[in-house]
From Swiss-Prot:
Substrates-to-products reaction catalysed: cytidine(1402) in 16S rRNA + S-adenosyl-L-methionine = N(4)-methylcytidine(1402) in 16S rRNA + S-adenosyl-L-homocysteine + H(+)
Single Gene Ontology BP annotation: rRNA base methylation
Lineage top rank: taxon: Bacteria
Molecular function in Gene Ontology: rRNA (cytosine-N4-)-methyltransferase activity
Residues the record lists as binding S-adenosyl-L-methionine: G33, G34, H35, D53, F79, D100, Q107
Name of the gene encoding the protein in the UniProt record: rsmH
Protein name: Ribosomal RNA small subunit methyltransferase H
UniProtKB keywords: Cytoplasm, Methyltransferase, rRNA processing, S-adenosyl-L-methionine, Transferase
GO cellular component: cytoplasm
Compartments, as annotated in UniProt: Cytoplasm
Cross-referenced InterPro entries: RsmH, SAM-dep_MeTrfase_MraW_recog, SAM-dependent_MTases_sf
N-terminal signal peptide: none
Length: 309
C-alpha cells in the first residue's frame, strides 16, 4: 500500500528552520517523507538529514521515495531516543529538528492498524508493531478507573466515566476486539444530543492511542533532549494536533526559555539557571483556509518554534 500522507504546514515548518546548505537536521517523524524531502532539497552534499520513525512501513516507503538522495540516514526507532541515536551516529550537535506529532494518513487509512474510528479493524493502534501493548489490552484489561483516567486526561472527554463503564460492561459479555465494536459502545455511552460536534469516538480513540504509544511521556523527554543537541541558533519546530499536546509544548518551551526557579519576589536570580531557548512565535502558526480546504486533517494543527541560544 502506498504511504499517502500530505504534510501539514509544510512551507511554514521548513521556512522556520532557516536551513543551512551544509547543516545537520533531524526529522523525528519521517512518515511519508514530505518534510524530509523539502529539507533534502535545500541541503548540499555536505549537509545531512537523520530521518527517524518507529513505523518500519514509513522507513521502507521513504527509502524508495527519497532514493536519489545520498545524505540521509534512516533510523528505525522512537524519537524518544534522539540523544542515544545521535550519540551512536557520532553526531554531537544538529542545526534543526522537526517533530510532526500527527498520525499519518497512511496509518489512518490502512485498515489493519486500528487507528481509525471510521473503518473496522482489529484494536491495535501501535505505531511500532514490535511493541507489546496494544489497544486491545487497554480496552479489555484496564480496570474502570484506569480507563476513565486515560479517556479523561488524554482525550479530554467529558463523558469519560460513562464510556469506561459501558466498556467494562460490554467486555463482560465478550472481548471487544474491533474498532467498530468500540465505536458502537462509545456511541451508546454518549447521549445523542452531545454527538453533534465531531465524531463521538474521536476523543476516546485519541486517548487510547496516546496510552498505547506513551506519546506524552515520550514528548516531554524528546523535546528536552532534542534542544540539548541543538547548535546555538539551531531551531526545533513541532507540529501538534490536539490541545493537550499543544499545551505541553507551549509549557515546555516556556520552561526552557525561563528555567529560573527563584521565588518571584527575589530581586536577582541566584539559582544560576539561564535561558536555553528563545521562543520564535509566541502564538502558534496555524494552517491557512486554503490548506484546510485542501487537507481537512490539517485543521487542528499548530506549529511552535524555539531557537537554541
Amino acid at each position: 500500500m502506498e504511504f499517502k500522507h500530505i504534510p501539514v504546514l509544510l512551507k511554514e515548518t521548513i521556512d522556520s528552520l532557516n536551513i543551512k546548505q551544509d547543516g545537520v537536521y533531524v526529522d523525528c517523524t519521517l512518515g511519508g517523507g514530505g518534510h524530509s524531502l523539502e529539507i533534502l532539497k535545500r541541503l548540499s552534499d555536505k549537509g545531512k538529514l537523520i530521518a527517524i520513525d518507529q513505523d518500519i512501513s514509513a522507513i521502507n516507503w521513504s527509502e524508495e521515495r527519497l532514493k536519489n538522495f545520498k545524505n540521509i540516514i534512516y533510523v528505525h526507532d522512537n524519537f524518544y531516543n534522539i540523544q542515544q541515536i545521535l550519540k551512536e551516529l557520532k553526531i554531537d550537535k544538529v542545526d534543526g529538528i522537526i517533530m510532526d506529532l500527527g498520525v499519518s494518513s497512511y496509518q489512518l487509512d490502512e485498515g489493519k492498524r486500528g487507528f481509525s474510528y471510521m473503518k473496522d479493524a482489529p484494536l491495535d493502534m501501535r505505531m511500532n508493531r514490535d511493541s507489546s501493548l496494544s489497544a486491545y489490552e487497554i480496552v479489555n484489561q484496564y480496570n474502570e478507573e484506569e480507563l476513565c483516567r486515560i479517556i479523561r486526561d488524554y482525550g479530554e472527554e467529558n463523558f469519560s466515566r460513562r464510556i469506561s463503564k459501558f466498556i467494562v460492561k460490554a467486555r463482560e459479555e465478550s472481548p471487544i476486539s474491533t474498532t467498530l465494536q468500540l465505536v458502537g459502545i462509545i456511541k451508546k455511552a454518549i447521549p445523542l444530543k452531545f454527538q453533534k460536534e465531531g465524531h463521538p469516538a474521536k476523543r476516546t480513540f485519541q486517548a487510547i492511542r496516546i496510552e498505547v504509544n506513551e506519546e506524552l511521556k515520550i514528548l516531554d523527554k524528546a523535546v528536552e533532549d532534542g534542544v540539548a543537541n541543538l547548535n546555538t541558533g539551531g531551531r526545533i519546530a513541532i507540529i501538534t494536533f490536539h490541545s493537550l499536546e499543544d499545551r505541553i509544548i507551549k509549557s515546555k518551551f516556556k520552561m526552557l526559555e525561563n528555567p529560573c526557579t527563584c521565588p518571584a519576589d527575589f530581586p536577582i536570580c541566584i539559582c544560576g539557571k539561564k535561558p536555553i531557548v528563545k521562543i520564535v512565535n509566541k502564538k502558534p502558526i496555524v494552517p491557512t483556509e486554503e490548506e484546510k480546504s485542501i487537507n481537512p486533517r490539517s485543521k487542528s494543527s499548530k506549529l511552535r518554534i524555539a531557537e537554541r541560544i
